[in-house]
Amino acid sequence: MKKSIGLVGDTGRMGVLLTQALLCRPHCFLGKGFSRRSQTSLEEVVTENDILVDFSSPEVTSLLLDFLLKTPRPVIIGTTGFTNDSGVKTKLSALSEYVPVVVCANTSLGAYVQKRLAAFAAKLFSTSYDVRILETHHRAKADAISGTAISLAEAIRSAKAESYEEEPEPFIEMHGSRLGNVCGEHEVSFVGEDERFVIRHEVFSRRVFSGGVLLILEKIMGEGLPKGYYTSDVLYESLFQEKVFG
C-alpha cells in the first residue's frame, strides 16, 4: 500500500523540491502539507498522513512534535537552529519511544563523507594542529552556525577523545557566513606548523538534499525502521559498509 507523505514547510526551498520529487515516486504519494499560509492545520497534516517530513522552523517543529506525541507517526526532521532550552530534544527523545525519528542537519552523501574524513583526520593529526571549520549559506538561513558545522565539530571532538583516551580541550575555530543564495559550503582545516590539510564540501543544488530525504523515506517504508532515534548518518553508514567492505 502506498504511504502518504506530509510535508511541513511545503512552500519553502526544500519543500518545493520535495513536492516535485514525491510526485514521481511509485511507492508513496503526497498528502496534505503545512505552511504558515496554508489553510490546513498542523494537526490535520499529522493525523491524515503516514509519514511526516519537516523542513520548517524551530517554532513550527516544536508544535509539530506536540501533535506527534498525541498521534505518533514516523518523522524526518530537517529543520535546524534549535536552542538548548526549546524542549525540542526532549520531545524528539520521547517520540522515538514510539516511532522512528530521523534527525538530519544535512542529508547529502557528500556531507557524510566529509564528516567521516574529518573524524579520521582528527585521529591522525596531533593536538598541535589547529582545527578550523568555515561554513557559508544563503543570506536567509536563520542559524548563524549551521547544524552541519556543529555536527562536524562534534565528530572531530569525539574522534580525538577516542584516539587519546580522554576528553581533550582543543579549540575548534568556527566561522559562519550568510551570502547571496549559496546552498551550502563547509570546509574543515587541520593547520600545523608546516602544513595545512583541508576537507571541503560544496553543494551546487538543493536537489542533493531532497535525494537524501528520498533515500531515508525508502528505508522507513521498505525496511520498516524500528522505533528509535536516528540520524542520516545511520543510513549512510550502512551504505558505506556495503560499498567499502561488502
Swiss-Prot record:
Keyword Protein transport: no
Pfam families: DapB_C, DapB_N
Domain of life: Bacteria
Cellular compartment(s): Cytoplasm
Signal peptide interval: none
Catalytic residue positions: 137 (proton donor/acceptor), 141 (proton donor)
GO molecular function, one term: NAD binding
The entry's keywords: Amino-acid biosynthesis, Cytoplasm, Diaminopimelate biosynthesis, Lysine biosynthesis, NAD, NADP, Oxidoreductase
Enzyme Commission number(s) of this protein: 1.17.1.8
Principal EC category: oxidoreductase
InterPro entries: DapB_C, DapB_N, DapB_N_CS, DHDPR_bac, NAD(P)-bd_dom_sf
Gene3D superfamilies for the chain: Dihydrodipicolinate Reductase, domain 2, NAD(P)-binding Rossmann-like Domain
Catalysed reactions, semicolon-separated: (S)-2,3,4,5-tetrahydrodipicolinate + NAD(+) + H2O = (2S,4S)-4-hydroxy-2,3,4,5-tetrahydrodipicolinate + NADH + H(+); (S)-2,3,4,5-tetrahydrodipicolinate + NADP(+) + H2O = (2S,4S)-4-hydroxy-2,3,4,5-tetrahydrodipicolinate + NADPH + H(+)
GO biological process: diaminopimelate biosynthetic process; lysine biosynthetic process via diaminopimelate
Positions with a binding annotation for NADP(+): 37
Residues holding (S)-2,3,4,5-tetrahydrodipicolinate: 138, 147-148
CC annotations in GO: cytosol
Binding, NAD(+): 9-14, 78-80, 104-107
SUPFAM superfamilies: Glyceraldehyde-3-phosphate dehydrogenase-like, C-terminal domain, NAD(P)-binding Rossmann-fold domains
Pathways per UniProt: Amino-acid biosynthesis; L-lysine biosynthesis via DAP pathway; (S)-tetrahydrodipicolinate from L-aspartate: step 4/4
Family in the record: Belongs to the DapB family.
Function: Catalyzes the conversion of 4-hydroxy-tetrahydrodipicolinate (HTPA) to tetrahydrodipicolinate.
Protein name, as recorded: 4-hydroxy-tetrahydrodipicolinate reductase
Organism of origin: Chlamydia trachomatis serovar D (strain ATCC VR-885 / DSM 19411 / UW-3/Cx)
GN (gene name): dapB
